[in-house]
Structures are given as structure tokens and as C-alpha cells.
């Protein structure tokens, strides 16, 4: 006569040690055990999938890539929102908070001296600043306050 394997020797790949069940011969225990088994069998069961190392690595890389791809834009958006809430009082670095920069062509004089040769010189009004000697700061647009990184204007090519 064939007998079923003892429940105390039941082994599972998901359990580190053999399942140890109390050895009660009462009908209460066997009835409870059969109810639990019946309940377990009534739900869909996920069985272990045999995955090789390359598949596991590929899945991990895919999940991490998606997480990073979503996480970076979310991080930038929160930084922009937080920066907009903070007051910006840092003076502009190029113009030291004045809002104007000295003209690079005439060095702030408003006129350009050109040596024609033979000892002759000609003084003319600066074509860059129109004789004003200074220009509006291109970094802060004349406000004197250093713009935040994402608020800086983009310079377009003159093509």
C-alpha cells in the first residue's frame, strides 16, 4: 500500500527549512489544514520562473533606466519651483550690480582714436556704444541682479 509523504518532511524551494507542522491527530487540525489548502488552490498561483543572469540584469537595467528617465525631469521641475519661490538678491557678476558694462571698443570713453599713419590720428565716436561709453549688461539685462541658471536668456546666432 502506497502512503503519502509525511507532512513534516514537506520541502519547498521558497522555504529555507523543512515545514514543521505540529503532530496533532485531532480532526480540528486536519479540517483547518484542508481549508487552508483549498483556499490556496482557489487563488491563482505564481510559479517560480527560471531566469538566467543576463535576463535578470537586462530587466534590472530596464527598470533603473525608466526610474532615472522619470526621476531627473521631476528633480529639475522641483528645483525650478523651489528657486522661483526664493528671492534672488545676488548682484550680477559681470556688471557688479550696476546694470551697465563699460564698452569694450572704446574702454568707456565714448570715442575711438585711430592712427592713420604718418603721425596723423583721427578721433571718432564709438560705433559700438554710440558714444555713451557703456552698454546694458547682457547677463542681467540691466537689472543688476544675477539671473538664476535657468532664467538666463539664450543668445541667438545672427545668421
UniProtKB/Swiss-Prot annotation:
Residues 85-145 are annotated as: CR-type-like. The keyword Protease does not apply. Keywords: Chloroplast, Membrane, Plastid, Repeat, Thylakoid, Transit peptide, Transmembrane, Transmembrane helix. Expressed in source leaves. Lower levels of expression in fruits and stems. Residues 1-47 form a transit peptide. It is found in: Plastid, Chloroplast thylakoid membrane. One of its GO terms (molecular function) is protein disulfide isomerase activity. InterPro entries: DUF5351 (IPR035272), HSP_DnaJ_Cys-rich_dom_sf (IPR036410). CXXCXGXG motif repeats lie at residues 92-99, 103-110, 126-133, 137-144. One of its GO terms (cellular component) is chloroplast thylakoid membrane. It comes from the Eukaryota. It is a single-pass membrane protein. Its main location: plastid. The chain crosses the membrane at residues 56-76. Pfam families: DUF5351. GO terms for biological process: photosystem II repair. Participates in determining harvest index (HI) by affecting source-sink carbon distribution. Up-regulates the conversion of fixed carbon to exportable sugars. Its sequence is related to the DnaJ family but lacks the J domain. The CR-type-like region is similar to CR-type zinc-fingers and was shown to bind zinc. This is Protein SPA, chloroplastic. It comes from Solanum lycopersicum (Tomato). The lineage of its organism: Eukaryota, Viridiplantae, Streptophyta, Embryophyta, Tracheophyta. The gene is SPA.
